[in-house]
């Protein structure tokens, strides 16, 4: 921003002079705030559009390239595997092989359990860890994320689906609606990425996500009490009161002690394995393979003891073979189309939030960048293709991704290795899971969701921002006391409410001068800062829009009234100048201009002059276009608060 100089006379009025005029002795040198060069409407629109949707300049690699090179770069942007695949070597493969085998041992038992969480046959969990990871490996940009079904999305999807169709009485329609929801989840994710609308998921605050995930984890754990205790008749509701009532009411006749012995023993084993892995990072493989070891041992135990004859519930038959096509099962018309769309949008957004958060976390650890919009397209494509190959909503799994990271994965090939292992399982090993007890699946899921209850993050949220803590607790209690969808609705609602509150009620502060400097700061933050006699300086910490313009005007007037009462009580010089520090005011609209005009008229009646300090380019431009700068006088707009104070109070050095 350029600036011009003009001196101030002894009466505090600013008299313009030419830049070439010599400055008089002891005359403060002040700077005029310049209006930025005017742009035509099209250029201004294109600049705003680019900064909003293309701030990362995704087309920069295409500049000054031949048509053939641009075509290749375009293909690589959609399929990053083409770029990194050229540099792939045996050394990278070793790391990916170990990581892929490790996460495969973790995903197989988890997939069976998560499918049951969504009220689907266990084979659909395995299907969902075969096709989607292959698609993501070709299109995704994260090296560390491990793809497959996850607990929270499985619970959410199952809850929403059961609200429409009973899976016990109408399993075929239920399955069709699941595939339809998965299709629209993928379409939603891909559309957000393609149209670069990924910022929409940022409206769900971190605090709300922490609360929602924690509540969902407890809900999932409570749902596993059916398999953990061997209860046959169990509530279909997910709230904590209904679940605990169902558990207690079946205590005398519904619990199976053999089931409890199996589930409790292996849960302790899994927790000890996790503890060992946390204490010694080199032993990360122990908690990774513990679930598969538990499945093998418990299955063998049930088989040789025939515990299933004594009330221990088992998985029973699992079909062999690859994913069958499910394209014809998707609803593209009829009553269930809109229901599938609604469920797909909700589950797709939650899955997207989790995957992007996981991808960014591990990318930061390895110091590389992922493109959020490309990730959304990749996740969307894999779910669209997955819906056509008998898969349900898949996303990035935090537990598997953490194991993948610690196992030393180098590229997305670890997902391909995992898919191959799942493929071999589907072709040859599924009959071996016939005697796998449901109790061990319950123990595995409980062990997997425990880390989702992040107590340390909740405590930190409480310390940092109490309103964030309210959002966190609102989502948490909404999930565990009502339902998953209500908890999600509360999380989104409170997140939006916080945004609206911050937009409509921006902070304002009175500024004072730091002794020995020309710096003006918040007097509450710096108690040593001194007020200037006859001058009130207020900073507005937000853009001034229609949503907050009246509040800003009223808040400034209230500051002024309080200051005048204090000055009158202390018999100090009355307020003659009101300086508004506008550095944080990034923009202003028509309502904001009208609010300043109303403030100016009100100050005139009280014989107080309005002065502005350091308005930014968009603001100063609009002040000139609206002629507000002409109204208050160009000599009342300054580059800094210090210059404004010096100009308004030329005898300041004698008084302070």
Curated annotation (Swiss-Prot):
Transmembrane parts of this sequence? 95-115, 120-140, 145-165, 177-197, 198-218, 257-277, 284-304, 343-363, 376-396, 413-433, 442-462, 474-494
Query: Pfam families under this entry?
Result: STAS, Sulfate_transp
Which residue intervals make up region (Disordered)? Answer: 1-30
Q: What's its membrane topology?
A: Multi-pass membrane protein
Q: Name one GO cellular component term.
A: membrane
PROSITE patterns, sorted: SLC26A, STAS
Q: Which SUPFAM superfamilies match?
A: SpoIIaa-like
Q: Which UniProt keywords apply?
A: Membrane, Sulfate transport, Symport, Transmembrane, Transmembrane helix, Transport
Sample GO molecular function, one term: symporter activity
Record topology, Extracellular segments: 116-119, 166-176, 219-256, 305-342, 397-412, 463-473
Q: Which InterPro entries match?
A: S04_transporter_CS, SLC26A/SulP_dom, SLC26A/SulP_fam, STAS_dom, STAS_dom_sf
Q: Give ranges for the Cytoplasmic compartment.
A: 1-94, 141-144, 278-283, 364-375, 434-441, 495-656
Tissue expression, per UniProt? Answer: Expressed in the phloem of cotyledons, hypocotyls and roots.
State its location(s). Membrane
What region holds the STAS domain?
A: 525-648
Q: What induces it?
A: In roots and leaves by sulfate starvation.
Q: Add the further remark from the entry.
A: Loss-of-function mutation of the gene result in an attenuation of the source-to-sink transport of sulfate.
Cross-referenced PANTHER family: SULFATE TRANSPORTER (PTHR11814)
What the record says about family reads: Belongs to the SLC26A/SulP transporter (TC 2.A.53) family.
Question: Could you tell me what this protein does?
Answer: High-affinity H(+)/sulfate cotransporter that mediates the loading of sulfate into the sieve tube. Plays a central role in the regulation of sulfate assimilation.
Protein name from the UniProt record:
Sulfate transporter 1.3
Q: What is the lineage of its organism?
A: Eukaryota, Viridiplantae, Streptophyta, Embryophyta, Tracheophyta
């Amino acid at each position: 921003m350029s600036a011009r100089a003009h001196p101030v006379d002894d009466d505090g009025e600013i008299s313009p002079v030419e830049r070439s005029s010599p400055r008089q002795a002891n005359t403060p040198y002040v700077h005029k705030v310049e209006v930025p060069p005017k742009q035509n409407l099209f250029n201004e629109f294109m600049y705003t559009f680019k900064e909003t949707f293309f701030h990362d300049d995704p087309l920069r690699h295409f500049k000054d390239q031949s048509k053939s090179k641009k075509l290749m770069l375009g293909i690589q942007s959609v399929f990053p595997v083409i770029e990194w695949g050229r540099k792939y070597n045996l050394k990278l493969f070793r790391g990916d092989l170990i990581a892929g085998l490790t996460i495969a041992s973790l995903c197989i038992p988890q997939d069976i359990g998560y499918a049951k969480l969504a009220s689907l046959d266990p084979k659909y969990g395995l299907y969902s860890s075969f096709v989607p990871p292959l698609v993501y490996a070709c299109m995704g940009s994260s090296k560390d994320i491990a793809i497959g079904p996850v607990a929270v999305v499985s619970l959410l999807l199952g809850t929403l689906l059961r609200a429409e169709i009973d899976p016990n009485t109408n399993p075929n329609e239920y399955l069709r609606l699941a595939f339809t929801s998965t299709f629209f989840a993928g379409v939603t994710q891909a559309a957000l990425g393609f149209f670069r609308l990924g910022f929409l998921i940022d409206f769900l605050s971190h605090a709300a996500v922490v609360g929602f995930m924690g509540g969902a984890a407890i809900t999932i754990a409570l749902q596993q009490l059916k398999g953990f205790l061997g209860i046959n008749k169990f509530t279909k509701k997910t709230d904590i009161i209904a679940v605990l009532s169902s558990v207690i009411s079946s205590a005398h006749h519904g619990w199976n002690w053999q089931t409890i012995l199996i589930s409790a023993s292996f849960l302790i084993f899994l927790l000890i394995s996790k503890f060992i892995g946390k204490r010694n990072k080199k032993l990360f493989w122990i908690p990774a393979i513990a679930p598969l070891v538990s499945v093998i041992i418990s299955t063998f135990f049930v088989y040789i003891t025939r515990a299933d004859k004594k009330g221990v519930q088992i998985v029973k038959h699992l079909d062999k073979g690859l994913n069958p096509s499910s394209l014809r099962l998707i609803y593209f018309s009829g009553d269930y189309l809109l229901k599938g769309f609604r469920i797909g949008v909700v589950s797709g957004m939650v899955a997207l939030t989790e995957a992007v958060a996981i991808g960014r976390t591990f990318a930061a650890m390895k110091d590389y960048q992922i493109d959020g919009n490309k990730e959304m397209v990749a996740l969307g494509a894999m779910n669209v293709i997955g819906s056509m190959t008998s898969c349900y909503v898949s996303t990035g799994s935090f537990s598997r991704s953490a194991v993948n990271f610690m196992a030393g994965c180098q590229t997305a090939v670890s997902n391909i290795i995992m898919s191959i292992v799942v493929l071999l399982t589907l072709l040859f090993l599924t009959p071996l899971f016939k005697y796998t007890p449901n109790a061990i699946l319950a123990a595995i899921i409980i062990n997997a969701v425990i880390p989702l209850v992040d107590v340390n993050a909740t405590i930190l949220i409480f310390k940092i921002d109490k309103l964030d803590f309210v959002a966190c607790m609102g989502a948490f209690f909404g999930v565990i006391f009502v339902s998953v969808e209500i908890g999600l609705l509360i999380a989104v609602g409170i997140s939006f409410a916080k945004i609206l509150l911050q937009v409509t009620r921006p902070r304002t502060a009175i500024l004072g001068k730091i002794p020995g400097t020309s710096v003006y700061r918040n007097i509450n933050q710096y108690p040593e800062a001194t007020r200037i006699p006859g001058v009130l300086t207020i900073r507005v910490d937000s853009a001034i829009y229609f949503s907050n313009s009246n509040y800003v005007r009223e808040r400034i007037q209230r500051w002024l009234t309080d200051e005048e009462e204090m000055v009158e009580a202390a018999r100090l010089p009355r307020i003659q100048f009101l300086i508004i520090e506008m550095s944080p005011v990034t923009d202003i609209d028509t309502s904001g201009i009208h609010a300043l005009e109303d403030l100016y008229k009100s100050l005139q009646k009280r014989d107080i002059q309005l002065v502005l300090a350091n308005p930014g380019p968009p603001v100063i431009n609009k002040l000139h276009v609206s002629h507000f700068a002409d109204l208050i006088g160009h000599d009342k707009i300054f580059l800094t608060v210090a210059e404004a104070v010096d100009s308004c109070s030329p005898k300041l050095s004698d008084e302070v």
